[in-house]
Amino acid sequence: MLLKRRLFIAASLFAMHLSPALAADAVSFAPQPPAIDAGAWVLMDYTTGQVLTAGNEHQQRNPASLTKLMTGYVVDRAIDSHRISPDDIVTVGRDAWAKDNPVFVGSSLMFLKEGDRVSVRDLSRGLIVDSGNDACVALADYIAGGQPQFVAMMNSYVKKLNLQDTHFETVHGLDAPGQHSSAYDLAVLSRAIIHGEPEFYHMYSEKSLTWNGITQQNRNGLLWDKTMHIDGLKTGHTSGAGFNLIASAVDGQRRLIAVVMGAKSSKGREEQARKLLQWGQQNFATVQILHSGKKVGSERIWYGDKEKIALGTEQDFWMALPKAEIPHIKAKYVLDRKELEAPIAAHQQVGEIELYDRDKLIAQWPLVTLESVGKGGMFSRLSDYFQHKA
């Protein structure tokens, strides 16, 4: 039973990872989102993972070359685990050569040739910048011994990242029965890439790549938009998928991720992603509300070797909120017992911290003791007994 409430903050600091139900409440006071002309879309706050607006976000759709995000993610995990090195030299096999390969007809290529010797780093650039299907195959052969084995690795990371709408059948994203993902899952994957690939993520912002005397431009036209600070991620297109785009924009210390699937044209996908990102930047703030180890209040503790105990949280918590709601944010902590009695250990949960927008609960976090309090001496405990029972 929750017995004590204390008001300790009246907004201008906030945020964190919260439950889906509370996350929806957190944006319930947001301004009207833009109308998006696409099959599915998501705007996600990078820091918190909160979805700020979305449409058909869990609809299973053809990812096309957005599949290559998972290909690159698996490559980076292999590097992290020291199975391979970015400087390893890969000998390109025949199945990665477009010549006489009907699978690659009319598709995006790095223009590798059988027998080429290319570093893992350069193949990764070819995968990301050129969207090279041949680069995907060369990397899959090198890391897993073949495409089916590499696809199995991709799907193992689907499970690890809890991508419930996603299944891969190819390493490159060309149309294949049973291959699908969703705008939401691709936003989650993009967030994992940005967080987990600091040495490779810069490749997503490269505007061109020259290989074998051929210079190709990155198909993400938003990289040239100087007003948006876009630094990734990827485009995709097949006749079955339509025009897909994932774009990430940095605004000061904030980052947003926009996913657009099934747009009508390459320019159309850029326009829809731009609308989402601009709306998010204009209307939301991502701020820290709680600091790990920082006291949010203190309470009387009975029968201890001190009279007060400091309370707070063990983690840093962030949250994305509509800017217009900042003046209306308040937080309280609530004890889960009538009184606190010693001895009590540090890091013990004794209640909850509650965040309100106006009168609406939008987030909760554990309230814990920040210090231990031992049992007091006989005379202090006796004094506490008479005070407590009075």
Swiss-Prot record:
SUPFAM superfamilies: beta-lactamase/transpeptidase-like, Penicillin-binding protein associated domain. Pathway: Cell wall biogenesis; peptidoglycan biosynthesis. It catalyses: Preferential cleavage: (Ac)2-L-Lys-D-Ala-|-D-Ala. Also transpeptidation of peptidyl-alanyl moieties that are N-acyl substituents of D-alanine. Residues 1-23 form the signal peptide. It comes from Salmonella typhimurium (strain LT2 / SGSC1412 / ATCC 700720). The keyword Cytoplasm does not apply. It is found in: Cell inner membrane. This is D-alanyl-D-alanine carboxypeptidase DacD. It is a peripheral membrane protein.
